[in-house]
């Protein structure tokens, strides 16, 4: 590798391994905990392997893949996070995004047949305008709507949930300072 080819490259200090020894008053550690990490070309962590106490049955591996939104230069939003051990997967989350890179849905797999779905909607300014939580025991989904100021599209004005509860906010736009908050409490 020549220095010319490295001149315009991007670098970051990547933690590739971490080891912690627990000495408990002894000269040698009675317990050691090690973790290894790996990264993609954008510096996103794609692998975390936790060796626990050194027992092969305790090893947990988290693998993460990311959305690649080249036009927006967004590479850090996870697409899937998978936690596995010796017996298979323990946790799984998938993430959907819109063309702007906003997260529109997360799916948390509680088992192969059970999925908890959160959905999100955004306005053209990238502000969150609706969040809907997973179904409860009765199939109901708690939702929240968010209203933003009409002038700057920066300041949250109101949050309302599907039960009819709401909170209202007022700001001093000169300083971005919250001046009033009112809710049912």
Regions found by a protein language model. Give the residues of each.
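Non-catalytic interaction/targeting regions
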Residues: 1-185
């Amino acid at each position: 590798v020549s220095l010319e080819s490295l001149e315009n490259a991007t670098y970051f200090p990547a933690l590739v391994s971490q080891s912690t020894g627990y000495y408990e008053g002894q000269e040698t550690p009675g317990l050691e905990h090690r973790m290894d990490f790996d990264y993609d070309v954008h510096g996103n962590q794609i692998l975390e392997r936790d060796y626990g106490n050194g027992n092969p049955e305790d090893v947990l591996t988290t693998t993460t893949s990311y959305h690649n939104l080249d036009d927006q230069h967004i590479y850090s939003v996870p697409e899937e996070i998978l936690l596995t051990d010796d017996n298979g997967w323990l946790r799984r989350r998938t993430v959907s995004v819109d063309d702007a890179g906003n997260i529109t849905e997360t799916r948390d797999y509680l088992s192969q047949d059970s999925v908890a779905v959160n959905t999100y909607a955004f306005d053209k300014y990238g502000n969150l305008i609706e969040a809907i939580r997973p179904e409860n025991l009765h199939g109901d989904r708690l939702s929240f709507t968010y209203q933003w100021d009409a002038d700057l599209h920066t300041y949250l004005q109101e949050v309302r949930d599907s039960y009819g509860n709401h909170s209202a906010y007022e700001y001093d736009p000169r300083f971005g300072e919250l001046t009033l908050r009112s809710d049912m409490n």
